[in-house]
Amino acid sequence: MDIEDVIAEVLQRIVPTKEEENFVSTLMEEIKEKTEETIEELNLDAKPYFVGSLAKDTYLAGDHDVDLFIAFPLDTSLEELREKGLELGKVLGERLGKYEIAYAEHPYVRAEYKGIRVDIVPCYNVKNWKDVRTAVDRSILHTHWVLENIKGKNNEVRLLKRFLKGINAYGSEIYIRGFSGYLAEILIIEFGSFLNVLEKSDFMLRKKIIDPEDWMKRESEITMKTIKREVGEDKPLIVIDPVDPRRNVAANLSWERYGLFYFKSQEFLKEPSTEFFFPRKKIGNYLSALRSRKTHLITLTFNPPKLVDDILLPQVERTAKGIKRQLELEGFKVLGYDYGREFIFLEVDRLEREGIKVKRGPLYFTQHGKRFYEKNDIVWIEGKELASEKPISTFIVDVLEEILRKGQFSAGKNIKDAIVKGDILVDFVPKELSKDAYLFLSREKFRVK
């Protein structure tokens, strides 16, 4: 198939039908009506806004999650915004059908209406970037900017989103670190089409900075501060937010996810296929992968605290890195790690280490040498210095249990206790983690060849 045929076939699968558009339109109208009624009943000074892909008409067929933001006046205190926002969310959630409380920067309500998820999020009714108080406030400005600038390129955005999903590079959440929907929209608006964005994959990386609203001219000092910060943190791409010069829209984008986009873009342009958009599921056996690699898999399973992914998973990542570092200090080579809400994977070169630990000591004719001699059971001389040895645990599970028991590892503050109380598995994972284990061991997560 040539590239035009591939794109035509993909568009048939990702562009909402007229019936679907009517369903979404009716759904949003009903939710808006119920929201306005609830605001009036509670006598609140607030205004509802739809944000996200549904509001911008860049959603993919079948993807109907609703983002409903309740905007309060700027003179509302943060405490009052949280309190009234949550109160409204609960009443509206009850009216829509069912709901639960979720937690991010502040609590919000996640409801369900006609089988569709509806996030009800309180925010400030900002008019420009100088009014922004909380992380979610910009969302209303983002929606306005995209609607003003997209100019009929909605399907180009859909193509880019589906491509990014297909190559496993979509989602700006901290545990994914890929392209956000808003970033995809900006790139289409900036470069004009899906194919142009792919063709610019190398150019973007070298140019590094994209500034759609010329903030460098309008607010040069603030924008340069943003650029210096992001360059200092070695970000692969800097996209100055069209609505706020203080923010890099690509701040969460990792080098690994951009690398997937970089290689897959070139591959698609060379050999176009619908496979990039709708890949076949990678099926494999983690035990076979272990046998072929001649390595070992250590799995820590635990019961996580009730936190949203954006808060929990960075803590799990920090813990995984801390345990990896400690195991390496204990003499084990850790070839890689991965993690999720309830697990940490560590691939190691061996399960046992040497049974003794040799410690180099001070000069034998010093006071330190005398204390070293008295403190240790087995001591010998190497030149002018003393050395000693002591027996140590050899099996990695014993070593790991000691590390956990003594708390000798860096960990997220909310998760350390859960890790310590969890289980340690060797070369085996529960059935529900077998796919994750295979993707980890096969390196499929970031594999480009």
UniProtKB/Swiss-Prot annotation:
InterPro entries under this entry? CAA_C (IPR048833), CCA-adding_arc (IPR008229), CCA_tRNA_nucleotrans_2 (IPR042090), NT_2-5OAS_ClassI-CCAase (IPR006116), NT_sf (IPR043519), NuclTrfase_I-like_C (IPR011068), Polymerase_NTP_transf_dom (IPR002934), tRNA_NucTransf2 (IPR015329)
Q: Where does CTP bind?
A: 53, 56, 142, 161, 170
Gene Ontology process terms (BP): RNA repair; tRNA 3'-terminal CCA addition
Where on the tree of life does the source sit, at the highest rank?
Answer: Archaea
Listed binding positions for ATP are 53, 56, 142, 161, 170
Query: EC annotation?
Result: 2.7.7.72
Q: What does this protein do?
A: Catalyzes the addition and repair of the essential 3'-terminal CCA sequence in tRNAs without using a nucleic acid template. Adds these three nucleotides in the order of C, C, and A to the tRNA nucleotide-73, using CTP and ATP as substrates and producing inorganic pyrophosphate. tRNA 3'-terminal CCA addition is required both for tRNA processing and repair. Also involved in tRNA surveillance by mediating tandem CCA addition to generate a CCACCA at the 3' terminus of unstable tRNAs. While stable tRNAs receive only 3'-terminal CCA, unstable tRNAs are marked with CCACCA and rapidly degraded.
Report further notes.
A single active site specifically recognizes both ATP and CTP and is responsible for their addition.
* Full protein name: CCA-adding enzyme
Which species is listed as the source? Answer: Pyrococcus horikoshii (strain ATCC 700860 / DSM 12428 / JCM 9974 / NBRC 100139 / OT-3)
Q: What is this protein's gene name?
A: cca
